[in-house]
């Protein structure tokens, strides 16, 4: 192991010990907020400590075996030492690989919940139906992760699905798992209204944004906002409310427009719209920072229309993610079994981070 990495691990090891001791003090035990904060910090480095401790233990066994090999004359002891050296060397190599991945820079947003926006793009009615299919897919995946889904804003489409839907998913490390879902999703299938059996191609754009919590301050000048109220509407623009409870907020400097009409009160819709706006402004800044990263990692959070990231081919029961040349059966994915593709995307992210780390040395 490189000295620099070993020293970093020793510092983390010491920090872990200090935090464990601090957690047992009366001051922290009597302060629930601080207790939870420190417990969370301990949990965030516990896996590194567990692997590093195994590394240290096996390193000691290895050194002892090497000493026996040098000092002992007994053939049986020498043979046992050789076996020990081979075993420990293999273990240590595996621990080093694990630690290399565990020590990679963490995305500060990985722990956050997400706000997902899906819009119908090319394809008219079929694109809107596809938006509905994607929403169901993410909802089923969230259910499988014991995560909560809350619709923040939606516009029903006459033929089915949505022209646009914005929803929040809350759970454990949701952003880390869904951040690479952003981009253009393309569907190829025979629409229910197609009498000639021809395959149509439609698209929907997905944008995954980290939900902004109270700790992050997003400064928005009230004079930069244009706020309009109107009556909420259903599919086809039909009014479903007799009061102006729906809210549209335009952030003039960025041109971002957000709407909310699903809450019954204007106050509730304004609160939701402001939450979406803050996440969009934060995500905009995040994309600027990510331009400095690798081509693959900068895709996180971007819903640019030019980025056709994935194709859902119904006739061939095939899903293809074009960024990593990953193909699998479509049916389980559209039913919410997203983990295989999420894991493949995260593996690609780790590979690029490792390569980037080596390039910077």
UniProtKB/Swiss-Prot annotation:
Keywords: Cytoplasm, Methylation, Protein biosynthesis
Function: Peptide chain release factor 1 directs the termination of translation in response to the peptide chain termination codons UAG and UAA.
Example of a GO MF term: translation release factor activity, codon specific
Stated name of the protein: Peptide chain release factor 1
Native source species: Mesomycoplasma hyopneumoniae (strain J / ATCC 25934 / NCTC 10110)
Domain of life: Bacteria
Family the UniProt entry places it in: Belongs to the prokaryotic/mitochondrial release factor family.
Primary localization class, coarse: cytoplasm
Extent of the signal sequence: none
Residues modified as N5-methylglutamine: 238
Record-linked Pfam families: PCRF, RF-1
Subcellular location: Cytoplasm
Cross-referenced NCBIfam families: prfA, PRK00591.1
One term under GO cellular component: cytoplasm
The record's account of how the chain is modified after translation: Methylated by PrmC. Methylation increases the termination efficiency of RF1.
């Amino acid at each position: 192991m490189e000295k620099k990495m070993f020293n970093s691990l020793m510092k983390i090891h010491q920090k872990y010990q200090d935090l464990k001791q601090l957690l047992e003090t009366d001051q922290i035990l009597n302060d629930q907020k601080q207790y939870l904060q420190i417990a969370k910090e301990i949990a965030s480095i516990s896996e590194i400590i567990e692997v590093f401790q195994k590394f240290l233990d096996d390193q000691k066994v290895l050194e002892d075996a090497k000493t026996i090999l040098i000092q002992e004359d007994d053939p049986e002891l020498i043979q046992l030492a050789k076996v020990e050296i081979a075993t420990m060397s293999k273990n240590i190599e595996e621990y080093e690989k694990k630690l290399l991945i565990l020590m990679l820079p963490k995305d500060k947003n990985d722990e956050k919940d997400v706000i997902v926006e899906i819009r119908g793009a090319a394809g008219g009615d079929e694109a809107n139906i596809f938006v509905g299919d994607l929403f169901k897919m993410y909802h089923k995946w969230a259910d499988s992760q014991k995560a909560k889904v809350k619709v923040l804003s939606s516009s029903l489409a006459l033929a089915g699905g949505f022209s646009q839907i914005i929803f929040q998913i809350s759970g454990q490390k949701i952003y880390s798992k869904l951040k690479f879902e952003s981009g253009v999703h393309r569907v190829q299938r025979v629409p229910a209204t197609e009498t000639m059996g021809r395959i149509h191609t439609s698209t929907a754009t997905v944008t995954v944004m980290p939900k902004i919590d109270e700790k992050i301050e997003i400064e928005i000048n009230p004079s930069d906002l244009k706020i309009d109220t109107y009556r909420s509407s259903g599919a086809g623009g039909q009014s479903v409310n007799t009061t102006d409870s729906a809210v549209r907020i335009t952030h003039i400097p960025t041109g971002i427009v957000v709407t909310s009409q699903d809450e019954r009160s204007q106050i509730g819709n304004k609160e939701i719209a402001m939450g979406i706006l803050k996440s969009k402004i934060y995500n905009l800044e995040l994309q600027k920072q990510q331009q400095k990263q690798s081509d693959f990692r900068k895709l996180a959070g971007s819903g640019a229309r030019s980025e056709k990231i994935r194709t859902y081919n119904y006739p061939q029961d095939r899903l293809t993610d074009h960024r990593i040349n990953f193909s699998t059966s479509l049916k389980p994915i559209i039913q919410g079994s997203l983990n295989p593709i999420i894991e493949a995307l995260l593996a690609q992210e780790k590979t690029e981070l490792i390569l980037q780390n080596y390039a910077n040395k």
